[in-house]
UniProtKB/Swiss-Prot annotation:
GO terms for molecular function: rRNA binding; structural constituent of ribosome. Pfam families: Ribosomal_S19 (PF00203). This is Small ribosomal subunit protein uS19. Transmembrane segments: none annotated. InterPro entries: Ribosomal_uS19 (IPR002222), Ribosomal_uS19_euk/arc (IPR005713), Ribosomal_uS19_SF (IPR023575). Protein S19 forms a complex with S13 that binds strongly to the 16S ribosomal RNA.
């Protein structure tokens, strides 16, 4: 007779807290723009050194103000740390796609999260589509 097996409780997986170049998200949110710029990738750093346009500034004001429904066409805007946890609707050329920002999306462009093209799914050929389909019996 075998001894009963001991069942071990499985510990839930602990997700490591996200850091960006050694800084936690809370630390990034507390930093000013002048402190964030050296941490950004080169393309984003160049954009912020040139300055934000009026539309980008108003988008940041809406986010800081706590508006619940934010819609934007600004696909070239960069995800700032204060956008983390917020949901923004981004226009993809046809419709607004709702995007919830995770910590991993810091300093990416908004346009990366609302794709403008769909994958093509071709259907089967219909009646009259090809010469061979002329002889398909109709139901």
């Amino acid at each position: 007779m075998a001894a009963p097996k001991k069942t071990q409780k499985r510990m839930p997986r602990r997700r490591e807290e996200f850091t960006y170049r050694g800084y936690k998200i809370d630390e990034l949110k507390a930093m000013g723009l002048s402190e964030l710029i050296p941490l950004m990738p080169a393309r984003a750093r160049r954009k912020f050194n040139r300055g934000l346009n009026r539309g980008e500034e108003t988008l940041l004001e809406k986010i800081r103000g706590g508006d619940e429904k934010i819609r934007t066409h600004l696909r070239e805007m960069i995800v700032m740390p204060e956008m983390i946890g917020k949901s923004i609707e981004i226009y993809n050329g046809k419709e607004f796609l709702k995007v919830e920002f995770q910590p991993e999306s810091v300093f990416h462009y908004l346009g990366e999260f609302a794709l403008t093209r769909k994958r093509v799914t071709h259907g089967s050929a219909g009646i009259g589509a090809t010469r061979g389909s002329k002889y398909v019996p109709l139901k």
